Regions:
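Residue-level marker of beta-strand positions
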Residues: 16, 37-38, 52, 83, ...
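C-terminal hydrophobic helical "lid"/dimerization subdomain
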Residues: 205-209, 250-300
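Short, well-ordered loop/turn sites that connect or cap secondary structure elements
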Residues: 31-34, 121, 211
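Glycine-rich cofactor phosphate-binding loops and adjacent beta1-alpha1 units
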Residues: 119, 161, 166-242
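Glycine-rich beta-strand-centered segment in the early N-terminal region that forms part
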Residues: 5-54, 95-97
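Mid-domain Rossmann-like dinucleotide-binding core that forms the NAD(H)/NADP(H) cofactor-binding site
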Residues: 36, 95-176, 181
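NAD(P)H dinucleotide-binding glycine-rich loop of Rossmann-like/cofactor-binding domains
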Residues: 47-130
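Residues in the short beta-alpha loop(s) of Rossmann-like NAD(P)-binding domains
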Residues: 156, 223, 249
Length: 300
């Protein structure tokens, strides 16, 4: 249990956002950011000075987990509000033709593109996606664009059906079929790229086991609880399998996400379960925590 300390508040959450330019500050040109222009923002607060920031990997910034935004002096990034103060370096302009419901996927898509890049999908690869939540579905969309045959492992029948409508070539119910055996039997070696989007350590172990020699296994999701899995060093040595992680969006992947959405290369609107005005925020949060919903959007 926890109490609520005065230092916890105010807190304005929300980091998957879309809005429009209301005003520009000193030193910012309206020619670059016209008033009323639609935009999204990468709201991860980074130091800009550490080794990773200087090498274009801002998602690994040493300060990224700082609990307070020192500049604004309040915790939280502020997307769940009418106004938000952002640095110009965080802003990405969007075409007016892009719907708000698609534009809010800029940040999660950017996270997934970072993961896809880590997976190094080649044309004709077999790709396994473990988990059929929002992030699993976005992995399906991106893997298909990369020219792969995509198989999803997901126990929920409705989510498996949705994955098929998004282009997934095959789906597995892991409660009925051993996903490791199924993937290996497809081509005799396993999947060249595996993306674990679930927080379950047993599934993380399956992800490693179904990865082909020379393949890439990407741990996209954090694990809860953070329970170690056993891996044979000799197997890793002889298979040359790569096990890696993917966390948050980089500047590079965020720009790519904006480009893909703006050009209509990715259509995430099937992943929106509901749109609520801000005066129905309570109903929105109650809908968001149900297991049968995907993204819930609150408008201001």
């Amino acid at each position: 249990s926890s109490d609520v300390c005065s230092s916890d508040l105010p807190f304005v959450g929300g980091h998957e956002i879309v809005g429009s330019v209301a005003a520009v500050g000193e030193g910012v040109s309206e020619r670059e950011f016209p008033i009323g222009r639609k935009l999204t923002a990468r709201l991860i607060q980074v130091c800009g000075k550490c080794y990773f920031c200087r090498h274009g990997e801002e998602n690994l910034c040493v300060d990224i987990n700082a609990p307070f935004d020192k500049e604004m002096e309040i915790p939280g990034t502020g997307g769940l509000g009418e106004y938000l103060n952002i640095d110009p370096s965080q802003a990405y302009l969007l075409p007016e033709s892009l719907s708000d419901t698609a534009a809010v996927f800029s940040e999660p898509l950017a996270c997934v593109l970072n993961s896809i890049e880590r997976g190094q999908i080649a044309l004709g690869d077999d790709v396994a996606v473990l988990g059929g939540g929002i992030m699993g579905m976005l992995h399906v969309l991106c893997a298909k664009l990369s020219g792969a045959r995509v198989i999803m492992s997901e126990p929920d029948a409705e989510r498996r059906a949705l994955a098929k409508t998004l282009g997934c070539d095959d789906t597995i119910n892991p409660m009925e079929t051993n996903p490791v055996d199924y993937i290996k039997n497809l081509n005799g070696i396993g999947a060249e790229a595996v993306f674990n989007t679930t927080p379950i350590s047993a599934v993380a172990k399956q992800a490693v086991e179904m990865t082909a020699p020379l393949g890439r296994c990407v741990m996209y999701s954090s694990q809860h609880p953070d329970k170690p899995i056993e891996i044979s060093p000799n197997w890793l040595h002889s298979s040359e399998t790569v096990i890696t992680g993917a966390v948050s969006p980089s500047v590079r992947s965020f720009q790519r996400a904006v480009n893909m959405l703006s050009k209509g290369l990715i259509d995430p609107e099937k992943l929106v379960s509901g749109v609520y005005p801000c005066n129905q925020a309570q109903e929105a949060f109650e809908a968001a925590i149900r297991p049968d919903t995907f993204r819930i959007i609150i408008t201001f």
